[in-house]
């Protein structure tokens, strides 16, 4: 179920405050955040946000196409290493 329209999108207040201050100063620095559930708003476009994936911060450059999505969508938490090989390939003849 999606969030109610009357509530508006969730954005971590500290993260939004940092973005707004950087927009006023016209500077572009990488911002570290653990808030994967924050929604990307138009003020964030053009910034690089380092989103925590559980062990490190993944730098994510925000574009206009990302507006409305969550930050966590762009920092995968699991690594897929592939399925086990078939016996034919592992068996020595």
From Swiss-Prot:
The keyword Translocase does not apply. GO terms for cellular component: cytoplasm; small ribosomal subunit. Signal peptide: none annotated. The keyword Transferase does not apply. Belongs to the universal ribosomal protein uS19 family. NCBIfam families: rpsS_bact. Protein S19 forms a complex with S13 that binds strongly to the 16S ribosomal RNA. This is Small ribosomal subunit protein uS19. The lineage of its organism: Bacteria, Bacillati, Bacillota, Clostridia, Thermoanaerobacterales. The gene is rpsS.
């Amino acid at each position: 179920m999606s969030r109610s329209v009357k509530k508006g999108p969730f954005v971590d207040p500290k993260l939004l405050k940092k973005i707004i201050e950087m927009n006023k100063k016209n500077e572009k620095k990488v911002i570290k955040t653990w808030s994967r559930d924050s929604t990307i708003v138009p003020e964030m476009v053009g910034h690089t946000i380092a989103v925590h994936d559980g062990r490190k911060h993944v730098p994510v450059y925000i574009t206009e196409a990302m507006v409305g999505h969550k930050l966590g969508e762009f920092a995968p938490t699991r690594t897929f290493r592939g399925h086990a090989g078939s016996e034919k390939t592992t068996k020595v003849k």
